[in-house]
Amino acid sequence: MIDRYKHQQLRIGSVSPQQISAWANKILPNGEIVGEVTKPYTFHYKTNKPEKDGLFCERIFGPIKSGICACGNYRVIRNEKEDQKFCEQCGVEFVDSRIRRYQMGYIKLACPVTHVWYLKRLPSYIANLLDKPLKELEGLVYCDFSFARPIAKKPTFLRLRGSFEYEIQSWKYSIPLFFTTQCFDTFRNREISTGAGAIREQLADLDLRIIIDYSSVEWKELGEEGPTGNEWEDRKVGRRKDFLVRRVELAKHFIRTNIEPEWMVLCLLPVLPPELRPIIQIDGGKLMSSDINELYRRVIYRNNTLIDLLTTSRSTPGELVMCQEKLVQEAVDTLLDNGIRGQPMRDGHNKVYKSFSDVIEGKEGRFRETMLGKRVDYSGRSVIVVGPSLSLHRCGLPREIAIELFQIFVIRGLIRQHLASNIGVAKSKIREKEPIVWEILHEVMQGHPVLLNRAPTLHRLGIQAFQPILVEGRAICLHPLVCKGFNADFDGDQMAVHVPLSLEAQAEARLLMFSHMNLLSPAIGDPISVPTQDMLIGLYVLTSGNRRGICANRYNPCNRRNYQNKRIDGNNDKYTKEPLFSNSYDALGAYRQKRIHLDSPLWLRWQLDQRAITSREAPIEVHYESLGTYHEIYEHYLIVRNIKKEILCIYIRTTVGHISLYREIEEAIQGFCQACSDGI
């Protein structure tokens, strides 16, 4: 379907029997209308040609070979319209064979059949509209019971036999025995109603606007009553109100889309185009057929049997007719959704048949696999792992993936540099993984961005561009700051990588899709490249330090895991001495030499504003030295004074983790200021 803006769209919904026949019917030059599939056959076993009026009939679905009819006559296919488009002998149209991908047929059902999606799927649309229990409707559809038609002021057979109580099954074994096929059909059409035809009659009698009005009034009355105090009654009222809301919404949808409720009961069953349910010949002359063909054959067999019972046989009991109608209903249910009513239908090898629902639903269905998630060239997929050393706009590609994605560019580079005479020699060098191959691949990747995509792509940041670099292993390395935009984490998530080929695509990737160009959320404008999950845990571990504090370290020296090499002696009554460093380089050097740990407390000489320490806080300890200088030890800093009480230097109590974080932030700020001063 194409809307007024020329956008291709797909709409799934109910259609009228007239629309189904319009999809399939074709008028031949002799006035014959073709489109109905009446035979359950596919190909003739001798000629291997499609059977006439069968599931692969060329008159209904078009020729197998373009411009060649079933007789073997050939005619050139032209664009201009001509009067004679059909073969006079076989009635096959001279068109392109691709018509068999979209030309449909139909099966004219001998009795109405409910669409199992609208009956059995929850919520049941038919049960909602009719306001009846689903179990009751199922019994009516599958001919387990019936109900009497209201016939006023007329003598009826049911009145002669007494009161006919609703849902009593005695009629099933007594009434049909008194009638032949035609008489029972007349009796049933006049006095009782059963099967899908009864559902269709009730749906056709519905007035959707009256349903909306009555449901709205009932909902208001239930709301005005208020809670009763009985929990069970209140829940019952709540469920009823929810049901009324769903019923009103469903009725409004039918009115808005111009769909009639009785269309949920089928009189014509559409037949899919042959190319969507093919029969393929494999090695050894064996044939492989789609399961849908077998399910269609089952429907046609049972439908033809019912037609014979209704037209040719005049002495068939009415009970047998109803049993055959039930079989037709079950065959259509299996075709549409195998197993929805319990045990699924299986073939001779105990394999479950794939119904129409199985073909289109799920991850491997028609929509998600071939329409929404098509496999494309120049793409790959792998697990993502964290790359903490990467820049924000870079990603790490495994060598195995990179050499496949950029293979044509590497081949071109080898030929241009006269390292390979042709494509075959270049491919052999790539297979042998010669060192020159990796050098050329590195040059190619420097000027070629890639696109990373994580499904489901729910917003614009679900696919971003990166500058690839080669990494070891088989996983894609990703900067942790871009995880929030992808809604990704490193617990086994997979991402797809695509190579933009055209200049327009590469320009779009560089100017609009690079990760460092998408730092804000397109929805609310908040920063989206923020630390999450692993980064937050790492920052916490980096800056957590020693929770015991300076007092606990001095007066509770039980835990000496990190400070065994700094004890003054082996006496457990003495505290761990915290080292002093004149600058951050010495502290980091001691950490690299494993003389201290990441969370080891230490004293670092610092240029601290003296006004910040002129408080009334009393020192925890004061250490005096022989030359008159002394150390005032506070909880977070240490002051060294001379004999005149002048401040010589100040130390702050910190850890190597705090120092590393501060240096990274300081370098980032300096780089930003330098970039601003240079006008970048």
Curated annotation (Swiss-Prot):
The catalysed reaction is: RNA(n) + a ribonucleoside 5'-triphosphate = RNA(n+1) + diphosphate
Location(s), subcellular:
Plastid, Chloroplast
The Gene Ontology biological process annotation of the record reads: DNA-templated transcription
Gene Ontology molecular function, alphabetical: DNA binding; DNA-directed RNA polymerase activity; magnesium ion binding; zinc ion binding
In terms of SMART domains, this protein maps to: RPOLA_N (SM00663)
Q: Does the keyword Cell wall biogenesis/degradation apply?
A: no
Q: What is the E.C. number? A: 2.7.7.6
Gene3D superfamilies (alphabetical): 1.10.40.90, 2.40.40.20, RNA polymerase II, clamp domain, RNA polymerase Rpb1, domain 3
> What does the Swiss-Prot or TrEMBL cofactor note state?
Binds 1 Mg(2+) ion per subunit. Binds 1 Zn(2+) ion per subunit.
Quote the InterPro entries the UniProt record gives: DNA-dir_RpoC_beta_prime, RNA_pol_asu, RNA_pol_N, RNA_pol_Rpb1_1, RNA_pol_Rpb1_3_sf, RNA_pol_Rpb1_clamp_domain, RNApol_RpoC1
Q: Which GO terms describe its cellular component?
A: chloroplast; DNA-directed RNA polymerase complex; mitochondrion
**Amino acids binding Mg(2+):** 489, 491, 493
Family stated for the protein in its record? Belongs to the RNA polymerase beta' chain family. RpoC1 subfamily.
The UniProt function text for this chain reads:
DNA-dependent RNA polymerase catalyzes the transcription of DNA into RNA using the four ribonucleoside triphosphates as substrates.
Q: How does it assemble?
A: In plastids the minimal PEP RNA polymerase catalytic core is composed of four subunits: alpha, beta, beta', and beta''. When a (nuclear-encoded) sigma factor is associated with the core the holoenzyme is formed, which can initiate transcription.
| Protein name according to UniProt | DNA-directed RNA polymerase subunit beta'
What is the organism field in this record?
A: Manihot esculenta (Cassava)
